[in-house]
Amino acid sequence: VMAVEARIQMPNVTGTAAQGYWPAFWMLGAPFRGNYTNWPSLGEMDIMENVNGVNTVWATLHCGTSPGGPCNETTGLGGSTTCPDATCQSAFHVYRIEWDRSGASEQLRWSVDGVVYHIVNQGDVDATTWANATGHGFFIILNVAIGGSWPARPSGLTKSGIPMLVDYVSVYKSI
């Protein structure tokens, strides 16, 4: 089992002041570097995404072809949950993906503060799609975008300059 996790406090802004905010912690397949045209087949694992300051975290595997394809692109194979105990914006939370290759079938598991809320199994897509999306290295990305294809468009009420705070990023591998 390999796990990638980070302890993050999303930008502490909500309501109309958060319109357009899009913090994310994600991994993109290494074959993207130098090619830039092979998304989503090379795999993208969104460990944490949030939009517009709502108390929801999204997790998604992007793979296959776009639009449509075995991973329902451009949406991907995703799930969501609220942050436990305190909002995503008002406190630090641990966002994690576990990549379990220990069984006969591989599995990706997403959790927040130790609570699993989304699972994608190898059998959810065909073997070629899974191999193309997971059979290589990944690079980790942490970013905050303002605007884009998913969040609302920023308005005059959007408060700029609110940071995403990152306590740590770790990668673990079972021996």
Q: In which residue ranges do the predicted regions lie?
A:
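GH16 jelly-roll
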Residues: 1-175
